[in-house]
Curated annotation (Swiss-Prot):
Its cofactor is Zn(2+). The gene is rhaD. Pathway: Carbohydrate degradation; L-rhamnose degradation; glycerone phosphate from L-rhamnose: step 3/3. Its EC number is 4.1.2.19. Catalyzes the reversible cleavage of L-rhamnulose-1-phosphate to dihydroxyacetone phosphate (DHAP) and L-lactaldehyde. This is Rhamnulose-1-phosphate aldolase. It catalyses: L-rhamnulose 1-phosphate = (S)-lactaldehyde + dihydroxyacetone phosphate. The active site is at E117. PANTHER family: FUCULOSE PHOSPHATE ALDOLASE, RHAMNULOSE-1-PHOSPHATE ALDOLASE. It is an enzyme of class 4 (lyase). Zn(2+) binds at H141, H143, H212. GO terms for biological process: pentose catabolic process; rhamnose catabolic process.
């Protein structure tokens, strides 16, 4: 008999959340992750689902996700504890047929609900499903230290921040050619920030929340983690460069164009 704890998606969430905590991106209960699951992913584990699952209503329209499964981190759960007790800190949910709420099918054994940022996750999933043709299945949010720091000193303009990050590491243009979206400070956990994040996610795989954190997406947990890790490394370099008095030389526009041609990527409009 298979055990859901040993499934690739629970084990993947354990590794991702622990890696994020080790990076220092997810202090206390900061950060959240969601992974869209296919029917084939869960079919072998349905006998472990709750017979009478709790239903939670939401205020958004998520009809585009009707009957879809997700594994998500729980509200108020510490990332450092997911590896210790995944059944308490994670949840498998299923969006209801009407798209007006979801059922908690597994997990959160000691009570609770999924992450308070679920509105931003679900709206972003809807958008990224369309943009990627269904390939993007992960939404990841964390408090990446250096990316947050930059929102205090750089103009909150996607083109400005994207260019600065591209200049700090050659691989950045290749890893996120669509650049970084940026939102001003907004109240977390509300529908408004969820819709605003999704709007940016329609154009960018990374979205910075000023003074708060970053959202990233990708087909897999590794892809989403690697995307944020790459941007955060570049932000760390920029923080150090700024602390040393600023740039004396950097990658030039014509060099970026050569880089884009070499790797077959199309840079975000207006950045070069």
């Amino acid at each position: 008999m298979q055990n859901i704890i040993n499934s690739w998606f629970v084990q993947g969430m354990i590794k991702a959340t622990y890696d994020m905590w080790l990076k220092g991106w997810d202090e206390r209960n900061g950060g959240n992750v969601s992974l869209r699951l296919l029917d084939d992913d869960v079919v072998s584990y349905k006998d472990e689902f709750y017979q009478n699952p709790r239903h939670v209503e939401i205020t958004q329209n998520i009809t585009a996700l009707a009957n879809q499964y997700f594994i998500v981190t729980g509200s108020g759960k510490f990332f450092r504890n997911v590896i210790i007790d995944p059944a308490d800190t994670l949840a498998v949910i299923k969006v209801d047929e009407q798209g007006k709420g979801y059922y908690i099918m597994w997990g959160l054994v000691n009570g609770g609900v999924p992450t308070s940022e679920l509105p931003a996750h679900l709206q972003s999933h809807i958008v990224r499903m369309k943009v990627s043709g269904g390939k993007d299945r992960v939404i990841m949010h964390c408090h990446a230290t250096n990316l947050i720091a930059l929102t205090y000193v750089l103009e909150l303009d996607p083109k400005v921040i994207t260019r600065e990050l591209w200049e700090m590491s050659t691989e950045c243009l290749v890893v996120f050619p669509d650049g970084v979206g940026v939102l001003p400070w907004m109240t977390p956990g509300k529908d408004e920030i969820g819709y605003a994040t999704a709007q940016e996610m329609a154009q960018h795989p990374l979205v910075l929340w000023a003074f708060h954190g970053v959202f990233g997406t990708g087909p897999t947990l590794d892809d989403a983690f690697g995307l944020i890790d790459t941007a955060e490394k570049s932000a760390e370099i920029l923080v150090k460069v700024l602390s040393m008095g600023g740039k004396r030389q950097t990658i030039q526009t014509d060099e970026f164009k050569l880089l884009a041609e070499r790797f077959g990527v199309t840079p975000m409009d207006g950045v070069l």
